[in-house]
């Protein structure tokens, strides 16, 4: 016993070795990491080897993935023309951490007209639906509408309205959402955006008619949920997320069909000067990023 004690004791008889974080079993560390958000897991992985190993454990990251992540991977595999089998094989070789990271990037589907990604802190599903995936009254008549290229859209194109009497934009999506509450927004901009000599310019030339009558926003789901709200469009020069409403998903194993629209069909006056970028779906409580705000 004395020999064993002397091998641990320092020259003054005091313990020369003190347990530290690096002595924690990797399995214990992994159990602690289950209670952290993904960005926090990545930060503590830098502490030492035990934390680094635990931060790569599949069971840690599987707990962060949405319950329908298999559906998401299959959705992406179907997007690859003739390469779906290769993507499925690659996904099987990936660890859960790599799968989480790949799903946090924008993932286009339906021919690139829609995309989804994971909100990195809680792993909730976020979605963006481009103007080209929407049904817009008069979109094929260039007297009324044009598609305008811009860097201010995830899809690099927005639908620009010059002038119209009957304003109606409709869309729908059928998707397997994890159980939870979601918010839906239209991302709109009054004025045509362009760049001149590297500077952002908003042309207000065609803006009119939006202060006379409000725009009606509507949302309905295959489970019978409905919301309706009205709002005047304002804030020229800014991208604004106009809330349409919330919907609840109770069963992630069942596809949820969502229909949404915005209309201003009072034909006593024309309206124009509006950019329609996309429709956004976010987990309730997660605010869409506020970007491209014009300096007034």
State each model region's role.
Residues 1-34:
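CRL adaptor-proximal regions
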Residues 5, 23, 31, 49, ...:
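Plant-skewed but cross-kingdom recognition/interaction modules and surfaces
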Residues 17-18, 37, 172, 230:
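Residues at structural and domain junctions
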Residues 18, 30-31, 35-37, 41-45, ...:
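Basic, Lys/Arg-rich alpha-helical nucleic-acid-recognition elements, primarily the DNA-binding modules
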């Amino acid at each position: 016993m004395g020999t064993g004690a002397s091998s641990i004791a320092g020259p003054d008889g005091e313990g020369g070795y003190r347990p530290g974080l690096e002595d924690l079993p990797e399995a214990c560390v992994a159990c602690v990491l289950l209670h952290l958000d993904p960005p926090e897991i990545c930060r503590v992985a830098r502490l030492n080897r035990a934390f680094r190993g635990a931060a790569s454990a599949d069971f840690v990251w599987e707990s962060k993935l949405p319950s329908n992540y298999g559906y998401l991977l299959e959705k992406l595999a179907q997007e690859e023309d003739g390469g779906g089998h290769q993507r499925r094989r690659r996904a099987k070789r990936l660890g859960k951490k790599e799968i989480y990271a790949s799903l946090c990037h924008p993932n286009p589907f339906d021919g690139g007209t829609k995309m989804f990604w994971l909100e990195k802190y809680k792993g909730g599903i976020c979605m963006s639906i481009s103007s080209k995936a929407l049904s817009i009254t008069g979109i094929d008549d260039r007297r009324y509408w044009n598609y305008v290229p811009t860097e201010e859209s995830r899809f690099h194109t927005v639908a620009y309205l010059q002038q119209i009497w009957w304003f109606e934009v409709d869309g729908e999506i059928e998707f397997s959402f994890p159980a939870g509450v979601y918010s839906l927004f239209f991302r709109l901009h009054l004025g045509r955006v362009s760049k001149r000599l590297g500077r952002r310019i908003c042309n207000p030339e065609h803006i009119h008619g939006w202060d006379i009558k409000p725009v009606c926003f509507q949302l309905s789901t295959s489970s019978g949920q409905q919301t309706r709200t009205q709002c005047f469009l304002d804030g020229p020069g800014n991208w604004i997320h106009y809330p349409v409403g919330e919907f609840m998903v109770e069963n992630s194993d069942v596809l949820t069909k969502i229909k949404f629209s915005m209309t201003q069909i009072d034909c006593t006056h024309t309206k124009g000067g509006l950019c329609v970028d996309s429709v956004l779906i976010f987990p309730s409580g997660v605010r869409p990023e506020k970007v491209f705000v014009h300096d007034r």
